Amino acid sequence: MAKKITAYIKLQVKAAQANPSPPVGPALGQHGVNIMEFCKAFNARTQGIEPGLPTPVIITVYSDRSFTFETKSTPASVLLKKAAGLTSGSARPNTVKVGTVTRAQLEDIAKAKNADLTAADMEAAVRTIAGSARSMGLNVEGV
């Protein structure tokens, strides 16, 4: 018989830098999960990602206090800010533009996010990322 699922926990943890401090420790501790075991497994799985990039993770906790987790790709907004060299998006994106991204940068981001996007093809994925860029107050060149 399959194990009974008791909780799903969604967090954003910096790649290869998980530690028991908040938000990881309290979120896992209240469900009785071994925090250090999660931190070691997460850090091992995210070794290939640039350290410090926020990585969404969905943790499934079972009734016997065991867990499994699935990592997602870094949010598009973080990748767009990195590509444009910004620390934050525009407070008024329709009127104040804070930076520019090129089609080549959008294609790179779309390739990195492809597994998590529901786009039918690469062109649709690029348009999706371009829409995110515009909503952050970035000018989009070539789309």
From Swiss-Prot:
One or more lysine residues are methylated. Keywords: Methylation, Ribonucleoprotein, Ribosomal protein, RNA-binding, rRNA-binding. GO terms for biological process: translation. Pfam families: Ribosomal_L11 (PF00298), Ribosomal_L11_N (PF03946). GO terms for molecular function: large ribosomal subunit rRNA binding; structural constituent of ribosome. InterPro entries: Ribosomal_uL11 (IPR000911), Ribosomal_uL11_bac-typ (IPR006519), Ribosomal_uL11_C (IPR020783), Ribosomal_uL11_C_sf (IPR036769), Ribosomal_uL11_CS (IPR020785), Ribosomal_uL11_N (IPR020784), Ribosomal_uL11_N_sf (IPR036796). It comes from the Bacteria. One of its GO terms (cellular component) is cytosolic large ribosomal subunit. Part of the ribosomal stalk of the 50S ribosomal subunit. Interacts with L10 and the large rRNA to form the base of the stalk. L10 forms an elongated spine to which L12 dimers bind in a sequential fashion forming a multimeric L10(L12)X complex. Forms part of the ribosomal stalk which helps the ribosome interact with GTP-bound translation factors. Belongs to the universal ribosomal protein uL11 family. PANTHER family: 60S RIBOSOMAL PROTEIN L12, LARGE RIBOSOMAL SUBUNIT PROTEIN UL11M. This is Large ribosomal subunit protein uL11. The lineage of its organism: Bacteria, Pseudomonadati, Pseudomonadota, Gammaproteobacteria, Pseudomonadales.
